[in-house]
């Protein structure tokens, strides 16, 4: 089965396919054998190539220095990147469109534009022990205004990429006052006093981005680090969720295609009696089912 992509999407597909096949795939085994780590010079090279292509700004508006790509173009990019292990494809951060809509000029200067230029990395501290996707009802981290600062207290789980990040997006609820229980989102520098690393759980993957658990102990966050206004936090988090989950789905499709290709190649090469296991209908059925499910 095939379908025609618009010219721009096809150009991106070919460009990223070349990047994956010529630069990334060759490092897969080493990355898988070393918890996602590869030599620093190779990692720097991959990051530079991604930055030179403009990938950190694929969703950022053109007038802000980004590429302003369509969602289809972005999905095609992430589908191709999905054909290699995340240990290698996650070689750049993203400055997304919603950030330019939500953030002040000072925040854009200090946090978002450095993402766009590939100078900083971010992570998201949203999830808690009682909140996964139920961000609205399960957030217990509080933010209480005290003069020119908000005081944050709580605990955050599965903060993916925290070990390599420069700053965090932190979700909380107003702890008291007229806006009590309304959601807020903050920028938090990782070296802020009171940010305590509790643990870094091991997952069954092989990339170098860890999933820290943090405790927030009376952290003082400047009012200027509030994104938008009190009550805006949830809609901005949902903006990130929508974009991220679409691209995760695209990446999974790319991974599935790669897996089917690898399985097919193996079946054609694996000897069995006078032929290969690809001669067996049972194997053919499984591969055909996999292709059908992918295209469905």
Q: Across the structure, where does each feature detected by a protein language model lie?
A:
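Glycine-rich beta->alpha junctions and the first turn(s) of the following alpha-helix
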Residues: 3-7, 11-12, 196-296
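Buried hydrophobic positions in well-ordered alpha/beta secondary-structure cores of metabolic enzymes
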Residues: 9, 20, 54, 61, ...
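Short secondary-structure junction/hinge motifs that connect adjacent elements
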Residues: 27-50
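Internal helix-loop-helix
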Residues: 44-47, 51-121, 160-167
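Short Ser/Thr-interspersed hydrophobic loop/turn segments at strand-loop and sheet-helix junctions
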Residues: 54, 77-82, 172, 188-193, ...
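A gly/ser-rich beta-alpha-beta helix-loop segment of oxidoreductase catalytic cores
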Residues: 103, 121-145
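Glycine-rich phosphate/pyrophosphate-binding beta-alpha loops
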Residues: 132, 157-162, 206, 244-247
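A short core secondary-structure module
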Residues: 140, 149, 153-198
